[in-house]
Amino acid sequence: MNISERVRKLRAQSLAAEERISAERALLVTRFYKSDEARDLSAPVRRARAFEYILRNKKICINEGELIVGERGPAPKATPTYPEICLHSLKDLEILNSREKVSFRVDDEVRKIYEEEIIPFWKGKSNRDRIMDLMTPEWLNAYNAGVFTEFQEQRAPGHTVLGYKMFRTGFLDLKEEIRRSMESLDYYNDPNAYEKSEELKAMDIACDAIIMYAVRHAEELEKLAAVESNAARKAELLEMASICRKVPARAPETVHEMLQHYWFIHLGVITELNPWDSFNPGRLDQHLYRVYKKEKEAGTLTDDKLWDLLGCFWVKFNNHPSPPKMGVTASESNTYTDFCLINLGGVKPDGTDAVNEMSYILLDVIREMRILQPSSMIQISRKNPDSFVHKALDIIKTGFGQPSCFNTEAIIQELLRQGKSLIDARNGGASGCVETGAFGTESYWLSGYFNLVKILELTLNNGFDSRTNRQVGLETGYAKDYRTFDELMEAYKKQVRYFADIKIRGNNMIAKTFAIWLPAPFLSLLLEDCISNARDYNAGGARYNTTYIQGVGLGSMTDILTSIRYNIYDTRRYTWDQIMEATRNDFEDYWDIQHDLLYDTPKYGNDDDYADQHAVMVFDIFYDAVNGRPDSRGGVHRINMLPTTSHVYFGSVTGATPDGRKAFKPLSEGISPTQGADKNGPTAVINSASKIDQLRTGGTLLNQKFSPSFFEDEDSYACLTALIRSYFSLDGHHIQFNVVNAETLRDA
C-alpha cells in the first residue's frame, strides 16, 4: 500500500492539529436542559431529546479532501466536555491548558462560556457530584488512600463493540423493531409497561436524530459541490452526499457506505456520552470483506480508492482524542488515545479460519498510517496461518507497539465460561486494552482499578494508612503479629474481601445513577435485546451484562510475598522488625537489606515455582472476592488483570515494599514481571504467567520487550511465532511486544 497525497495531507493535518477544549457540546446540552422543552420529560426521553438537539445544532465539519465525513467537535481534535457527567471548574480548565503531558488548549472564549453558562447551571448537579454524595465514608477513605479507582466518576459506561448486526442494518430497520416492541407491551399485566414505552420512545427519537445528522452532512456536501471548480472533487462530494442520504438510515452495501455508516454510529455514541474506551468497530476485516469481495468481483472498487477510503477512515479516529481527565482519573489513564481496538483474524461463527484478504489489507493500513489511533490487534487462532502472524510482525518489529496479539481460543473459552452462547463467543474479541467481550450483545463496564499491593501495605499496618493518616482497612494486626505465612495470607484475604465489598457496593449504586439519570438511548439501539427488552443499555437491557474490576500489581505482589516468605519465614534471614524498619526508612541506610531483597530473592517471571506459587495465591484471593457477585444490571462482577497507567498512580500512593521497591515507585503492570526481575528470557516469563488461570478472567495483559537486533536473525519470525503459539497453548490471553533498544530506554 502506498499512501496517496490525499491521505498524506489528512494524516499530516491530524498529527499537526492541536488538542483543544471545545465548549460547543457543553453549551448545547446546557441550553437544552435549561429550555422549556426539557421539562416534564422522562429521563430517557430527555436524554434522547438532548441528543437530538446537539446533533441538530452542532457545526458540520467537512475537511478538505476527505472521503469519510463527521467530527465530534467543530474541527479535528476540538474535544468536547460532558458537564452532566463531570463538571470542570475554571481551575481544572487552567490545569488542562498548562499541564506538561496530555494538555488541551483552553482559550478565553471557552473560559467565558464556562464561567457564565456551564458552571452556574451544572454546579452540584453533575453525576460525579451525585456519585460522591452517595458514597460511604468507607468508600471515600479507600478511594482517597489509593485502594481503588472509579472509572465512572468522570466518564460514562459504553465499553462495548459493534457486532455483525449493525453492519447489515439501517436505523429505519431499527425503527421498525421499536414499533413491534412497542406493540407487544402488555399494559394489563406488566407494571413496567409505561416505563418501557418511554425507553422505546427515546430510542425511536435517537434513530431519527442520527438520520437527521447524516442528512445535515449531505446538505453541506451538496453546498460545497455547488461551488467546487475541480470536476473530480465535485463528483466525490456529490457521491458522499448520496451516501450520507442513504446511511445510516439504510444498510450499507459498499465499502464506502459501510465505513461512513459505522462512522456516524461512532460519532453518535461519543456525542451522546463519553464512554470509557470509546466504542469501536471490532472485527473490521470480517465486516468489510463481504462488501469488498462483492465490489471487487463487480469491478466497482479500485485498489487506489480502497486505500484512500481506509486511510481517511483511520485519520478519523486520530482526530478524536479521549475527553480530558483530571485528578485520579488522569493519573490512572491519562492518554489522548481512546483505545478503539480494531480486531483482525480469529475464527468465523462456524469456527473456521477467519483470516481473509481484508485482514492483510488492514495490516498494510496499520503499517503505513502509523498513527496513535485507532489501536489494533490480531486474534490468533490455531486455525490461522503463520503468514498472518508474520505480517503482523512486519509492523511490530518497527517499534510501533501495534498490533497486539490475542488468543482466540482463550477468548472463546472465557466467554463460554461466563455463559455466552458459542456463536456469540466466536463473534467476540477484545476491546480497550485487553478486555474480552461478546461483540454486539454485551454491555461490559470497567468499574475501576484495584490496588493489590496497597491492600498488603494496610494488612501489615493493622489497616492504617500513614499517607492519609486514616484507619482505612480492617484491624487484622501488624506485620510482627503474623507468626506464620498462612496467618499473613488469611489476614490479606480478609482485607481484599473487605475492600471488594466496598467497591462492589459502590459499583451497584453508581450504576443505578446512570440507569436513572443518564440513560443512553442511542447506544441502546446498537446492542442486541435492548429493543426487545425495552430496557436501556445502562439498566441491563443488553443480552449480557458484566461489571469488571481490574487487579493491578500482580508481579509486585508476587515478589513481595515471595520475599516475605523466603527472607522472614523460610530462611529467617531477617525479622519482621528489620524489614519494616527498612521500608519505613525507604531503605536509606539499609542498602544491604534492599540488595538481598532485590537480587538474592526468587522473583516472578523466571519459571520458578517457589515465586510463582504466590502469583496463583494472589490471583485466587482476588478472584474469589469478586467473581460472580451480582451487579445492579442483572449481571455479575468479574475480574481483569490490567493497569493502563494505574500501576504508576498506585505506586505513587504506596510506600516502600518488602521486595526492595522504593516508596512511591511504579508497581508492575498487568501480569508482567516487576520491571527488571525476569532474568531467564521470554520463555520463562510465559511459563510463569501461564500458571495463573487466565481463562477465569475477562482479560490479562502481558508486555514483553525485545531489542531491534533480535529481528536481524532470519529465524526471528519463526521463533517469535512459536513463542506466541506456545503461550497461547498454555491458555495465555494476550501478549504485546515493545521493540526498543537500550539507548531508547535510557533516554525515556
Model feature map: region roles:
Residues 201-212:
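Extended non-globular scaffold/tether segments
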Residues 211, 218, 222-225, 234, ...:
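Heptad-repeat amphipathic alpha-helical coiled-coil interaction surface used
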Residues 2-202, 232, 236-239, 243, ...:
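Conserved catalytic cores of very large enzyme subunits
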